[in-house]
Amino acid sequence: MLAHKSLLSFTTQWATLMPSPSTFLASRPRGPAKISAVAAPVRPALKHQNKIHTMPPEKMEIFKSLDGWAKDQILPLLKPVDQCWQPASFLPDPALPFSEFTDQVRELRERTASLPDEYFVVLVGDMITEDALPTYQTMINTLDGVRDETGASESAWASWTRAWTAEENRHGDLLRTYLYLSGRVDMLMVERTVQHLIGSGMDPGTENNPYLGFVYTSFQERATFVSHGNTARLAKSAGDPVLARICGTIAADEKRHENAYVRIVEKLLEIDPNGAVSAVADMMRKKITMPAHLMTDGRDPMLFEHFSAVAQRLEVYTADDYADILEFLVGRWRLEKLEGLTGEGQRAQEFVCGLAQRIRRLQERADERAKKLKKTHEVCFSWIFDKQISV
């Protein structure tokens, strides 16, 4: 069993710096382990709805002027469709004679039989996150200056968003089909969770502001790259090389997409360093909430927290990863080397550049407290037929 690095028992002071329970970091779930069905699922409270359209109108011109740059520097990071992998390449071939097709399905089930239930909790959570893609395209199209104004706009920003969505669409399709064929998960509850999540939307705190939006997507793509890479590692060690290749292939896509969004923020830092570094600080003060933070299966109102706790325990995505991503972005964007900033820009720079170290110190204290408490909880996950998992 992998080491359990808990995010429990924060004081109020610690919580002002650490990711909130609605982030992708795991916090110790509280309350009864057995979740009873309720008539109307309660969506987690929204936190960032009071600010909209916060980018000054004059900065709209920045994104208009960057359309040519985005065409030359961002669109080439997409792959032509005929060079992209497709889910069918990884799955049993239904065009084969029936006996050969069923043999391939049987082999898939034999491979997945060695994977523990807790692994499926994490894999299903990742799949559901990927499957809520309509929400993410909608979110990007709320951003002023870069949205697709017509649904088929030829601007570089709109072209990127549509093609990015098309590439991402393969991820959920592939994982969902693999899970379906494995027989290890309750697809009815998985599908209900997807529908709930898309219906709930997301609340990332980007305020229709592309500065904030592209900081968010930079962090989020890096986080999904890390998560899928770790599920690949676990699948390989548990004896499913095909699933390992699937997760690794998805991780490679996320890395390429991360590079695009990181490159956009780099350009904004070049053109408007004060505005861009302030946007980074703004998003980090809010704490990056990952796309599926409003997840529910209709029964467990803390499903996202419970899923995140399992991901933390399996070291698929941890508090250390959160700090690592922040350090990576600070280095990639060379934030420590920015010069000529205003007072506000300098304060933002100091906050962001020192934040990862502060997070690590607070996490070390939380880990020490968790070791002393030595408490675990059993939680039923509907995705795996109400089996109990320690979190």
Swiss-Prot record:
Kindly give the InterPro entries that the UniProt entry links to this protein. Answer: FADS-2_CS (IPR005803), Fatty_acid_desaturase-2 (IPR005067), Ferritin-like_SF (IPR009078), RNR-like (IPR012348)
How is its cofactor bound, per UniProt? Answer: Binds 2 Fe(2+) ions per subunit.
* Record pathway: Lipid metabolism; fatty acid metabolism
Where, by residue number, does Fe cation 1 bind? 130, 168, 171, 254
UniProt KW Ribosomal protein keyword: no
Q: Which GO terms describe its biological process?
A: cellular response to hypoxia; fatty acid biosynthetic process
GO CC annotations on file = chloroplast
Q: Which family does it belong to?
A: Belongs to the fatty acid desaturase type 2 family.
What PANTHER family does UniProt report for this protein, alphabetically?
ACYL- ACYL-CARRIER-PROTEIN DESATURASE-RELATED (PTHR31155), STEAROYL-[ACYL-CARRIER-PROTEIN] 9-DESATURASE 6, CHLOROPLASTIC (PTHR31155:SF31)
- Quaternary context: Homodimer.
Descriptive protein name? Stearoyl-[acyl-carrier-protein] 9-desaturase 6, chloroplastic
Q: Which organism is it from?
A: Arabidopsis thaliana (Mouse-ear cress)
